[in-house]
């Protein structure tokens, strides 16, 4: 054929059925191709039925008639019909140009004429818009929502003609259809010329929106294309001069000319609609012919509807706006062959639903709207073939067919690009426009169509191993029925997707490509067959390089394509080809096996949730992986089998067997999932166990066993150490879980017959326990079993299933013979009660035939024969019972000489007659069964004793250096659920067994190499089993209780976490103890041996020497009191110690009152620097000669205090130092263990000294005395702090408390604990409602905390709005309480206002201490803190126990600074000069005065909340902000401004916080003045400027009004109104380019709204006065200074407006008056709103300005003045008209 070399077009069949001049594939109104092809052969019209594959009907026109065009025109009954445009120069039918409608009679090959109509001009194209079937019923016509005059027609067709004529027509029915004479009706009233509105005389005026136009002679323009946009009912008319007319057939009755972008012929127009477009756009593609300078081109046009406007559904599609989205020139394209939409059905179920307005209509030919998918179009064109170097360049050029598919959905996914671009790969594909190459010659090709009537006509390439973008290109689509209509034949072809094309090429040329894969690998990746980011070519993204494997990445990419896409035959041929070396074959086998094993683990990863009971069904991705794995395993198995035969390698044969095991496992797993065997049903599993137990007991009674029991025993002998046994004895293993059952299929040591019998029996038991129907016949069981296992799975068939059922029946059936023998045996003797003895046998009570079985008789005969023959043959030793029976057998056969002396002596007769035979052999007496049983029991007793001794030892041991030695596992965390040797949370039970394998097996398990598998090894089966087994991390059984506890509930409180490998005894002891054991004490009086191991000394548990703790990783040892110690232990303490310590507390308080230290916080030391008065501490140090005692002795941790979390880096150094100190002390004396335990919580009643119960050391008592001192001091401080305040005590439950260690030798620890205690002291004070100045400090707190994170819109607005309402509703009592000076014992803690104290906690529950607060929690607490205090009393506030984060701590420090300053200013007369202010954020050795630069830096970074109240300032201002309006701020605003500037500090790398002691009020005032001066000198930042602008009294709506005034919209002015009887009516004269319009009385004047044209509609009649009243009146010529705005909807519905309210032709003067009036109104509204804003600003702050908007908004007056200046400048500028659309 002519397309044999084509790679995309695949020819199926050709039909040489005719010779013709033109072929047309019929399409319905929306472009769906139908299975009919029309052929024009001179004056004969033929119809080829594709389904019948022959010409079925024809019609012969009169001689000399020329057939122009044809279209689909069904009858009212839905029968096939066509519409034909005919030219008859002889006028044999009475007309030269006419249109006929032909209908098909199923019983006759001839067609009949049903309708006809004469046309005035020569026909060029015909198009059926709405057929008789579409409009047969009145209800159907109503659904179409057409113009009311068109609704009366039986059908609507469009006829394009020469001389610029396009008609909407209704054909006239023929009275006698069967008449041989053609009757052509001439009814001009049924013809409506759409182009008359734009034709004046013999000139076509193509006018655009901007009023520019071009004139063309009508004789040179004709209609070249017709198409219907179904959603908006718009007819698109393509003109030969490049223009396009859009005529709306809906009730809007409007026409418009689209933008003229070229002057070339519009060949075809194809409507498109994207899938589920929310914007309701409608698209169409217009194909443009070539010119001498340009190739052919496509244009993508978009029609926009009024979806964003509030209009009715019927008006939504009125007057759409069209624009070009994409233009693309097809290089070397010569002419268009076919442009056909690809229309498919979205869902067949949607065809039955009732269609509404969106669907337009419902009939046999059209499915508008949601049922049809019209997102693609086929573009077929002729292209000049490229000349190859070997061809003759002077030869005639050859033209071939080339096609492209445009997908608008893919264009959407690429974010509607404006040009066609490639993806940058080797194939150079476009994401939404795919080119199809072919070698089909284009000389006689007339049309190409794609049928999509059946579901299999269109398919997309799918891949289970790749999700590349190329798989969603149009090139990934395959079309099965593509018909190419030629002049001489019809070819049925297939368009194949590019992926299949590349796969076929790789398969055919695989032997050559495997040696040179560089080029093809890049093509494979460019087609998306594998992912680009996988260099190794594996789709699992986990395939590592195999050791000593020489395969390149390009070869792996090629092999992946062959293996994963199922090219089995081509891949297996490589094993038998002689041109491929054996080395390469082995490497390919190793690679294939590696891919199979790796993909098996991928499948296990996706099924693990189902096996573990965490999900009930597989995901779609997992289902695809299972299906792909089954195919992959078959390909690999076939290659390994072929390669083993070619290379004669047994190892490869064994590996092939392992691959088939993986395939059986995967396939059976899929079947179990499909039949709901997986996931496990616990109830059904229990039923299976009960059924098996019942059957086993029945078989035991029958002295037999079940067949499945023998199968399990054989499995145990073949694979005793397999992981599927799950440490269960084999006789109790059945029925297993599905996981264990399927796992045995992966074991290559077990034969296939055993696997088959086991699986079949399991499936039978599962079916038998069905809750729906438990009674099944044997046939039903067999059929259901074969249905689940599928035929040939493990070579199973119905015959083998029946055999297994029969064997099970026999085991459960009891025979009469066996019952009799059993009864006789029980009568003679019972093995359970007595044993066999010589006395019973000599008594003749038991005959030998009953006592000795047949098998034993045969064995005894052989033994007797061997014994009688004599010689050196050594007889085997029998067990005692068999020996007795054998002696009886010899006695019965009278072989007395062979009997033993024991048997002879037991028989009186024999001992009398044969006394010499008693001691003839020197063998001693053998042990009886009783003796052996006693010996075994004694051994077991001793073994149990040793085991019990081992169990008394500690459960968790420290790690040992020898890793190969295995220690006894710990039972603390369950049997096999977890292990102490793994860092992960869960280690499967088989992990330890896996670790026992050698390095070769470990390398296989770790995906590192499989060379060890193919190497010679005696344990090959074990290694293969290890390789293909389910990974241990997925081998976890289903546990419902564990799943509920882990997945839906909180973890158990007494469940300790798993412990990793321990490297010290201390960690072992901490991790191993349970949560309910309480405090552990060890006696030190028992010494530990030097060489004793931990196992030997483990049971003592009394002597642990902690001096051996030298590990650097030891945790910090801290003090913790036990809750279990009650008050009865506390009362035993002596009162003398309590009194002494109270005196020490008072002395220490007096010393601390004289000296104030600066202490560390948990922040970095460089973050904060606090000014303090150091004269008093220095004097105290000088007098005493020593430093001030640490503050930790004075302050103690309270149970209701909030403890901040410590920094990890800081604590790591602290732990190391503490450990070092304890080690040094341990050399001299024993100390307490210091283990801090999370389950021991200290209560309030535990605050006194607690004696040690089990240890009497003096050292430990000393350490507890220190604790008692701390407790007493804490109680003293708490009582002193609460005495001056007359508030109620907080009633709370005792809260847990963690006692911090007391190590006075370490300075860092001093600061750590003192900082904690200071924080607690400040939080102990009762809440004080802030005054105005303190309110400002709270604002500063909010600002500082808020600035720690990027501000969001919510925090910026809410924080400012809420801060203004915190001073409202103040109680006078609270104000008086604020002015009360704090007492001495409070130590100025009442000044600080913590955000955590202001929060209320209704429940008083203890939150988690270890979880730091999130950012949202911190921000929300800061924003709401000020407003929550408003209506609450101090005694109602309850402290919250969540520890503050780092941001909260820094914010509290900042708030303390601001609060201290405000108190200093307001309480100067009442404050004592000796008061000291405690610092919370400065280290002991850091005291610095901030310079001016630091102050400037601090004030520069002000927060948004602060910058809002700061307006533009003058250098003389005293710090108060003044808005632009001149309004004086209120006192609260002024105070807020000044205090905010004084206290506004932010956190940076080295931020400085000023803290002034009480005697330095003058210094503080000077400092505040310096800050104000520094702030005035620096330039205003963006936030400051925006805040000052925001305070102006400008209504925000005024700027919007002004912008609306400036914005004008043009009215589309090229829609025409046409009279229904408009044959002789002339068109209005339109002014030429650049000239004003002539004022003619006969022609309507063009208004400024239309910009040079009159509004045009399809219909205009004198009878329709209401329709004409909707069009605007005669207006003046257009001026570009229009400012009024009229929408299309206002023009269309203008009849609803009263005549006296209409404004005719508003001139420039009137427009100015209107604008002035509007501006006055807007100014008045602005003033009224501004005045209300002024009143409101006294109560609340202005909204925070948004980031980046620093420019002040203009007022309405300024906007109006600017608009006037712009209009004057525009009026002075001349109007430039162009054929192209004006750029707005």
From Swiss-Prot:
Residues 1126-1149, 1279-1293, 1337-1351, 1367-1382, 1428-1444 have a biased composition (Basic and acidic residues). It is found in: Nucleus; Nucleus, Nucleoplasm; Nucleus envelope; Nucleus inner membrane. Residues 945-994, 1115-1784 are annotated as: Disordered. Residues 1297-1306, 1533-1546 have a biased composition (Low complexity). It comes from Caenorhabditis elegans. Disruption phenotype: RNAi-mediated knockdown results in embryonic lethality. Impairs assembly of the nuclear pore complex, the integrity of the nuclear envelope and distribution of the integral nuclear envelope proteins lmn-1, lem-2 and emr-1 and the nuclear pore complex proteins npp-9, npp-10 and npp-1. Reduces the recruitment of npp-10 and npp-5 to chromatin. One of its GO terms (cellular component) is nucleoplasm. GO terms for biological process: cell division; meiotic cell cycle; mitotic sister chromatid segregation; mRNA transport; nuclear pore complex assembly; protein transport. This is Protein mel-28. Residues 1352-1366, 1383-1398, 1445-1459, 1581-1606, 1716-1735 have a biased composition (Polar residues). Residues 1630-1642, 1746-1758 bind DNA. The gene is mel-28. Residues 846-1071, 1601-1784 are annotated as: Important for nuclear localization. Keywords: Cell cycle, Cell division, Centromere, Chromosome, DNA-binding, Kinetochore, Meiosis, Membrane, Mitosis, mRNA transport, Nuclear pore complex, Nucleus, Protein transport, Translocation, Transport. GO terms for molecular function: DNA binding; molecular adaptor activity. Residues 1239-1601 are annotated as: Chromatin binding. Nuclear envelope protein which has essential roles in assembly of nuclear pore complexes and in chromatin maintenance during the cell cycle. Appears to be a stable structural component of the nuclear envelope during interphase. In dividing cells, localizes to kinetochores during early stages of mitosis and then to chromatin during late mitosis. Important for several mitotic processes including chromosome condensation, kinetochore assembly, chromosome segregation and cell-cycle timing. Its main location: nucleus. The keyword Acyltransferase does not apply. Residues 1222-1232, 1266-1278, 1321-1336, 1566-1576 have a biased composition (Acidic residues).
